[in-house]
Amino acid sequence: MKTRVVLILALSVCIEAASEVIRARAYIFKAEAGKIPTELIGTIDFDQSGSFLKLNGSVSGLAAGKHGFHIHEKGDTGNGCLSAGGHYNPHKLSHGAPDDSNRHIGDLGNIESPASGDTLISVSDSLASLSGQYSIIGRSVVIHEKTDDLGRGTSDQSKTTGNAGSRLACGTIGTVEERILETTTASLPPVTQSQPIGSSSYYYSTFYLPIILYFLLSRIL
């Protein structure tokens, strides 16, 4: 009887953890050719609200105009942000606009910089998520040199990258505690990436563990 109770409690805890709303942050660094970027130019906070992921933040030093804004598959920001790999696209679809039914999970469209001052970022997306099998935690957010053509252009790169040009800045997306979200970027509080990018252990812990526990529970009961 005790074993049953323990397993039921363990299963409920795992299910609750898997569905828990996670908040995340990415510190944005200016790309440096061949190097890991070190110049901090902004911060972006991620907040899951129902089925929508909300991104809010600001970045400095961008040229006026629109810049492609994407989630990339890896959290490695080395080599001038090139080590982040391509757009996060686990379903192998063509590049598109944020409101397209077929698009990369990482396709967040464009952000727009003013003629002077910081670039304010306010984006909502219904496809990217901070939890589940296709979580973007531990991946990277990348800001590009040019406007993303949203897959509507005539360039050969339109259907893969939106022809958005080189990578100007990037940052790894990591989970944070509520108290850290209230701090400034100057103090650079710790951001936690609980599992390496591309590691199956993260997906097993959030997606498969409740299923495994349910199987064990059904065998015992």
Swiss-Prot record:
Keywords: Antioxidant, Copper, Disulfide bond, Glycoprotein, Membrane, Metal-binding, Oxidoreductase, Secreted, Signal, Zinc. The keyword Metal-binding applies. Cu cation binds at H70, H72, H87, H144. GO terms for cellular component: extracellular space; membrane. Residues 1-19 form the signal peptide. One of its GO terms (biological process) is superoxide metabolic process. GO terms for molecular function: copper ion binding; superoxide dismutase activity. Zn(2+) binds at H87, H95, H104, D107. Binds 1 copper ion per subunit. The keyword Membrane applies. Its EC number is 1.15.1.1. Glycans are attached at N56. Pfam families: Sod_Cu. It comes from the Eukaryota. Disulfide bonds join C81-C170. Its cofactor is Cu cation; Zn(2+). PANTHER family: SUPEROXIDE DISMUTASE CU-ZN -RELATED. Protects cells against oxidative stress by converting superoxide radicals to hydrogen peroxide. Oxidative stress is involved in various biological dysfunctions and senescence. Belongs to the Cu-Zn superoxide dismutase family. This is Extracellular superoxide dismutase [Cu-Zn]. It comes from Caenorhabditis elegans.
